[in-house]
Amino acid sequence: EFAPRINGRQYYKNTYICGGVDFIFGSATAYFENCTLESLPEGGGYVTAGSSPKGQTYGYIFNHCRFIGSEPNTCYLGRPWREYAKVVILNSKIGDHIKPEGWHDWSKIDAHDTVYFAEYKNYGPGAAGARPSWTHTLTDTEAEKYTYASVFN
């Protein structure tokens, strides 16, 4: 079943979500807590394709999630479908299916200044790579902005 890909706020908890390419897509503010996201082998692409509108505070937030897949080094955490995509992944286990660079710019060099792809205290083989310079590693203080209470209050 599909969730709407429109502006709005969505909350997913203890959910299993799978897909091939861009299976988390759209412009909503969506908070994923303790979810499992499986990249299927036929996809070989991207978990997220954020399209947050300019000025929207949040995009996709993943907290205490598991990113799994069967084929090593075949997927990215995300790419910017639109120039202001926002994806933050915190405290999550990243499998070895995620490429070392983690994020892809989809040949949108100008988006390096406008997208916000960030990580915080992730672990696992896919979290250990060298991320692009235009992505962010959050500090403890910055990560507080991405709690459930901060996003939905």
Where are these regions (language model features)?
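Sequence-level preference for short, compositionally simple segments enriched
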Residues: 1-153
